[in-house]
Amino acid sequence: MKILLADKQDITRAGLNYVISKMEGLETQTVEDKADLLLTLRENEDTVVILDYTLFDINDATELLILNQRFPYTRWLLFSEDLSTDFVKILIASSTQFSVLLKECSLMELKEAIRFCVASNRFVCQRMMEVL
């Protein structure tokens, strides 16, 4: 299965590429911006998008929800430094296709989140669960 990396930080992309390369049956592809993401999802929407929402060119929760409706087989792993509680609540309440992982989480939690998303299950990291 293909994992799309939608993160502007080179070091984060390099780390994710490395971690995912060690996981069987998965491959990564980097998307540079929203236009590139849309083109790639049109080719194959049955994928996982690891998205740093705070650094990518998606404006708000509404826009992300529209993308979720447009590509219903895509799983979204929001992987960011800081996400507002209200933002996360909106997404979690709207669709089971959204998962949440903070960049401060452990490597074990990162791998678990990716496995959950690949299996079409929702994942919310422990830290975010405590806040919600």
Q: Model features per residue range: what roles?
A:
Residues G25-D33:
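Short hydrophobic/Thr-rich beta-strand motif most characteristic of the beta2 strand and flanking loop
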Residues V88-I92, Q97-L132:
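Short, flexible helix-to-coil linker/hinge segments that flank and couple to helix-turn-helix
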